[in-house]
């Protein structure tokens, strides 16, 4: 009797395709670094940079870009010079600039007093800690990726802008010179 019961075949889950771009927060930070604007980079400027340098549909990922900006401001990696929320201008925080040199300096100090074996163990622990953080960030863009098939339609829509009609300037007709009597 166990043979007569039909078992449903298990659905084979397809492995999620890895996104062709880094996490949104990394792209936003790179955009602000590259733009180097004195008063901070605006949201449209950041989107324009991301669209030009990464294979990302900015219209569909606008939500993720805004979310990344807000979270980076909360983490104090960015400073909002103008506006509120995700609008306005953003600069790299002084703390974010100073963190990178400190992070490089700390492992060097740790290696000198300890044995080589202990020093090699530390970087492996750091790598293990970093990998789980990257995976959740990669899942979010992967969920948005299947929607990319629709992008050509949206890109075509802005291209259909109505041409601006050029107004021809008609020069005033010269009046015939009055006949001499």
UniProtKB/Swiss-Prot annotation:
The keyword Manganese does not apply. Its main location: nucleus. Transmembrane segments: none annotated. The keyword Nucleus applies. One of its GO terms (biological process) is negative regulation of DNA recombination. It is found in: Nucleus; Chromosome. It comes from the Eukaryota. Keywords: Chromosome, DNA-binding, Nucleus. PANTHER family: H15 DOMAIN-CONTAINING PROTEIN-RELATED, HISTONE H1. Histones H1 are necessary for the condensation of nucleosome chains into higher-order structures. Belongs to the histone H1/H5 family. This is Histone H1. It comes from Tigriopus californicus. The lineage of its organism: Eukaryota, Metazoa, Ecdysozoa, Arthropoda, Crustacea.
């Amino acid at each position: 009797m166990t043979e007569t019961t039909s078992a449903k075949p298990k659905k084979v889950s397809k492995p999620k395709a890895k996104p062709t771009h880094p996490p949104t927060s990394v792209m936003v930070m790179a955009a602000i670094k590259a733009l180097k604007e004195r008063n901070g980079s605006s949201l449209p400027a950041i989107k324009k940079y991301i669209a030009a340098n990464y294979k990302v549909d900015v219209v569909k990922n606008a939500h993720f870009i805004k979310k990344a900006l807000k979270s980076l401001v909360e983490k104090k990696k960015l400073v909002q010079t103008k506006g509120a929320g995700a609008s306005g201008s953003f600069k790299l925080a002084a703390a974010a600039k100073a963190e990178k040199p400190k992070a490089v300096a700390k492992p060097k100090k740790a290696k000198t007093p300890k044995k080589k074996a202990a020093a090699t163990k530390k970087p492996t622990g750091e790598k293990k800690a970093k990998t789980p953080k990257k995976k959740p960030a990669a899942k979010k863009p992967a969920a948005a990726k299947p929607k990319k098939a629709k992008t050509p339609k949206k890109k075509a829509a802005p291209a259909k802008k109505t041409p601006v009609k050029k107004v021809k300037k008609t020069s005033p007709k010269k009046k015939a010179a009055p006949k001499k009597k």
